[in-house]
Amino acid sequence: MNMFITVQIVIVLVLAVLSEAASLPTATERKDAMDEGPNQSDEPEGSVADPSTKDDDYSDSLKQDEKYYKVRLLNTGDKFYGLMG
């Protein structure tokens, strides 16, 4: 009797782990999300931005960050309360 219950518990746990694994994003989806992340820039690393467009670039970057994090939070099932800061 105890062995039967133990086997049932193990089966339930295995099914729970498999269903959770099936809901996770694949490696390709994670890579795509990272490629589209908030740190994307048209400028090569180490370049200096034009100071006259600094505020516009910063504002656009914040908008992209906010959109990215909203999408990431929605995809993970978390509630979005707004960006801190």
From Swiss-Prot:
Matching PROSITE patterns: TACHYKININ (PS00267)
Source organism superkingdom: Eukaryota
Keyword Signal: yes
Secreted recorded as keyword: yes
Recorded GO CC terms: extracellular region
Residue span of region Disordered: 26-61
Effect of loss of the gene: Extended probing times when mosquitoes are fed on mouse or chicken but not when fed using an artificial membrane feeder. Reduced blood-feeding success, determined as the percentage of engorged mosquitoes after 90 or 120 sec, when fed on mouse or chicken but not when fed using an artificial membrane feeder. No significant effects on blood meal size, fecundity and fertility. Lower blood perfusion during probing and feeding at the bite site. Reduced endothelial permeability enhancement at the site of inoculation in the host. (Microbial infection) RNAi-mediated knockdown results in reduced ability of mosquito saliva to enhance Semliki Forest virus infection in mammalian cells.
Residues excised as propeptide: 24-74
InterPro entries cross-referenced by the UniProt entry: Tachy_Neuro_lke_CS
Subcellular location as annotated: Secreted
GO terms, biological process: immune system process; neuropeptide signaling pathway; vasodilation
Alphabetically ordered keywords of this record: Amidation, Immunity, Neuropeptide, Secreted, Signal, Vasoactive, Vasodilator
Compositional bias ranges of the Basic and acidic residues kind: 52-61
Tissue: Expressed exclusively in the medial lobe of female salivary gland. Not detected in female carcass without head and salivary glands. Not detected in male tissues.
Entry protein name: Prosialokinin
